[in-house]
Regions:
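Ligand-binding pockets and gating/stacking loops
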Residues: 1-149
Length: 149
């Protein structure tokens, strides 16, 4: 029974469960797609909806945390994007030393979505019509084109 919601026991769970499972699964998927020659036509995106608080034991959302847990933190988190023309080994952006806030090249979730559309050859600002027949952009954001070769 595994969960990424680590309000308690973060160091042990990351070392013994979460990190090894993600490392093996994600690296295995990317390597397999590459070996089969289909990584360049497949976009792999690995991201959560928020990060974890920079300090152990601090409650930021009202959830109870033990001294070895971290709470929800929407201000700074990481993601992995690979394949489909993404530069290999490229690191985009930088956080401060405690991972509390981005300090270089932050990417908003809207920009990530625009980047996904861009990788498919779809203009992120394409107009679509909602259920009331009102025009809306797919996403009001620019793709992070620096990620691409």
């Amino acid at each position: 029974n595994h969960s990424w919601d680590v309000h308690k026991g973060l160091p042990k769970r990351m070392k013994d469960q979460s990190a090894p499972m993600l490392d093996a699964g994600l690296s295995g998927l990317i390597a397999d797609l590459d070996e089969r020659g289909i990584l360049d036509e497949t976009l792999v995106v690995c991201v959560g909806e928020f990060g974890r608080s920079p300090q152990l034991g601090i409650s930021t959302s009202g959830n109870g945390n033990s001294a070895d847990g971290r709470d929800h933190w929407p201000y700074c988190y990481t993601g992995v994007v690979a394949g489909a023309g993404i530069k290999r080994g490229y690191v985009h952006g930088k956080s401060d030393k405690t991972a509390s806030a981005p300090i270089e090249k932050p990417v908003h979730p809207r920009e990530l979505l625009a980047t996904i559309y861009h990788s498919f050859g779809i203009d992120p600002e394409t107009l679509v019509y909602n259920h009331l027949n009102q025009p809306r952009e797919l996403v009001k954001a620019q793709a992070v084109t620096e990620l691409f070769t």
